[in-house]
Every structure is written in structure tokens, then in C-alpha cells.
Amino acid sequence: TLTNLTLASGEDATEIAALLNVAGAGSVSVDATGMVAAQLAAIHDAAGAADSGAGIAKIATNGITGDLAISRTGLTEIEMNGLLGKASTAANVTVDANNMSTTELQDLHDNIARIDSITNATVTTTEEAAEIGSILSKATDATVTATSMTAAELTAVAGNIGNVAAGGLGTTLTLTSAQSVDEISALMGTATTDNNVAVV
């Protein structure tokens, strides 16, 4: 059994899997800087099947440091969630949220304290208000599909409006008296002439 093992981008995916197979549980540290999806998948699964978690069980708590880049390219939802769960808050964790599902966005929300920045995020009414707020808090130029959003969801959007792309509120925005003056101002400031804005 290997102990005090540290993995880095110099090891390829096959080497990472082989080393993790003989490492002790919870004993391995990872510097994720420069790692590509195949290496990160090996960190999660070792030589096991995809989503097996055979590798991530060997990683120490907060054991992933360095620059960790997460996206759907080459990684499953289970793999992304597992990697985020073992990332140190001191790591630089960046997420490309392009085309992420509701479940994947929920995972980002659950691990938001470990994430430094999120790009290409799109949130909709399928996300809860708390999820919308946390995801947008780390986002850059996010897109919001505001159609049918509740007052609480729109409050979460308004509170993070600076992280929403200009004109990024989708096609339909409905405002009611449940929104404060400041929230209405923030939302209208990001709406464009392409938005169908209803005030009821």
C-alpha cells in the first residue's frame, strides 16, 4: 500500500489509475494544475468503471489543490461532484457550466464554497432561489431564463445582477409588487428591448 502519495499532471491517466489502485484510503493528495479531463476522471474512478468512485475514495479530505478546471467535457455529473467535494477551499476551482443540467447545477450550489468562478452558466426556474443566488454569485456574464420565475427567484437574480450578461434575462420577464424598487431597477437595467417585460 502506498502512503503519502501526491499526484500531479506529470502522471498520465493510466499512471494515476495504477497508483490509486494501491494507495491507502483517504491518503492521497492531488495538485490538479494542468490536469485534463482524462486525468481527472482517473482521479475519481482509478481503474474502475466510470462513476465508480474507486479513486476519489483514496483522496484525502480537502486533498485536491492547485488549479482545478471542471466542465462537462469528458466528465460525468458524478465525477464532477466527487472532485468538487474533495477540493480544498484554497484551490483555484473554475467551472465551465456550459450545458449543465439541473442536477449538475445543484452540485455546484452544494459545493459553492469551494468554487472560485463559473463561466457559461444558464439558470432557469427549475433551479431554486438559493441555487440561483449561489451560482450567480460566482458567475461571469451568466444567462438567466427569467420566464415563469417566482418572486424569490427574481430576487436572487436581482441580488447578483452584476454577474448577469447584458441582455441576459431571456425573452420574458414578469415583475410584480413582490419585487422591491431596487430589484425592479436592477432587473430593468439588464433587460433590453428584446425582452417581453410584463408588469402585473
Region locations from a protein language model:
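Solvent-exposed, low-complexity segments and loops of surface/extracellular structural proteins
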Residues: 1-200
